[in-house]
């Protein structure tokens, strides 16, 4: 178990700080700027980095995170920011691969000099980019990283996205409530993605724990579009349940092709399909897909009511999980910075010290977020109590749909 070290952040510099690059084991937390206060101008906004995918096949997920973060920025600034000082979110596109995430983190740390980072979009990216921030002693809060081992990357790594080991089994249990006669299960997963490899292990273990027969495990790539071979192989074994661990584009296409080939049973989608963007991929054939949830738009609570209202007014639909988690990650930084500033004026702290103190503060707090109340273990794992399962319900036009939450 890691010892919590302080996470500190400071106000946006009005002059350039000389920081070394974060790659190749360099430690940007120790350089000649250690005695420079975090700001020389109390009116400067507080920079928080947002590293989400805005391009590539992962953009369908990343854009939902961007939406939630932007809502949080305006919401908390309208409420006074950090004791009167506004926050300023600095966005960097991670793209869909590890190199993109590494570049985004390096830019946020070295050029933008952020106090902390929210991101990256994928767990696969986190395993490559988070060590950069860890060496630089820059706090990171994962908003959509659910694979096993994320908080264990280092002292400065936390997440508000509940681990797949807690969330995923709920959808299998829901499927068994809908059809208690399920016996045979086919599993599909994207073998080139760390999260999906982690998630499928949980799904496969859950299948065994429920006494079900795992008849086949089919592999694919997140970049694939043709699943005829894998789908046909699985359908020939007559499964009662299909479980898919993929992203929204590939996962949605797999759902569509399974239905087109005649599969009639229940389909479970993993966390990568937990976005309304999947509806435009499989359209009418998305109907009935089950997906476990770490967020419900109907969760009671003042801040979720506010978040849901703002999101719905802006996007004309209920907020998805990834937007709520991104909002919550920004909220954690805001509340931790406010608490820290009341102890020691953050504008007077050197940036390395500020990042360290911020890290320490955020790990000790409790937060009433759109996800419900959350907190963190000493090693940065989120503590969350409430989880859900939703079923996709498509309208007759085959274009519009929603996530209907099961009781």
Named regions from a protein language model:
Residues 2-4, 13-18, 22-407:
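Extracytosolic ligand-binding ectodomains
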């Amino acid at each position: 178990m890691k010892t919590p070290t302080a996470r500190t952040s400071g106000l946006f510099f009005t002059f350039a700080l000389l920081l070394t690059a974060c790659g190749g084991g360099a430690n940007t937390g120790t350089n000649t700027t250690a005695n420079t206060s975090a700001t020389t101008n109390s009116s400067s906004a507080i920079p928080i980095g947002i590293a989400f995918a805005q391009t590539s096949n992962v953009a369908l997920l990343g854009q939902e995170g961007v939406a939630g973060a932007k809502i949080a920025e305006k919401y908390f600034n309208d409420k006074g920011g950090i004791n009167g000082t506004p926050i300023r979110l600095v966005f960097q596109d991670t793209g869909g691969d590890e190199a993109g995430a590494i570049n985004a983190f390096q830019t946020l740390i070295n050029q933008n000099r952020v106090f902390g980072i929210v991101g990256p979009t994928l767990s696969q990216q986190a395993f490559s980019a988070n060590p950069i921030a860890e060496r630089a002693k820059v706090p990171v809060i994962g908003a959509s990283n659910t694979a096993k081992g994320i908080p264990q990357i280092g002292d400065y790594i936390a997440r508000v996205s509940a681990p797949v080991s807690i969330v995923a089994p709920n959808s299998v249990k829901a499927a068994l409530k809908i059809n208690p006669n399920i016996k045979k299960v086919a599993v599909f997963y994207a073998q080139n993605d760390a999260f999906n490899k982690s998630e499928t292990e949980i799904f496969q273990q859950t299948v065994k724990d429920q006494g079900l027969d795992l008849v086949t495990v089919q592999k694919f790539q997140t970049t694939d579009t043709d699943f005829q071979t894998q789908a046909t192989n699985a359908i020939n074994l007559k499964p009662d349940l299909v479980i898919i661990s993929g992203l929204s584009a590939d996962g949605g296409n797999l759902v569509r092709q399974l239905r087109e080939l005649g599969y009639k049973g229940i389909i479970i989608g993993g966390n990568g399909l937990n976005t309304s963007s999947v509806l435009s991929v499989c359209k009418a054939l998305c109907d009935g897909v089950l997906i476990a949830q770490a967020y419900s738009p109907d969760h009671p609570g003042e801040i979720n009511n506010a978040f849901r209202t703002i999101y719905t007014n802006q996007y004309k639909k209920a907020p998805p999980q990834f937007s709520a988690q991104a909002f919550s990650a920004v909220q954690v930084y805001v509340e931790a910075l406010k608490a820290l500033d009341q102890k020691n004026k953050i504008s007077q702290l050197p940036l390395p010290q500020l990042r360290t103190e911020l890290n320490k503060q955020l790990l000790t707090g409790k937060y009433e977020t759109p996800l419900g109340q959350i907190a963190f273990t000493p090693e940065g794992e989120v503590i969350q109590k409430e989880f859900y399962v939703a079923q996709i319900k498509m309208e007759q036009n085959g274009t519009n749909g929603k996530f209907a939450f099961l009781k």
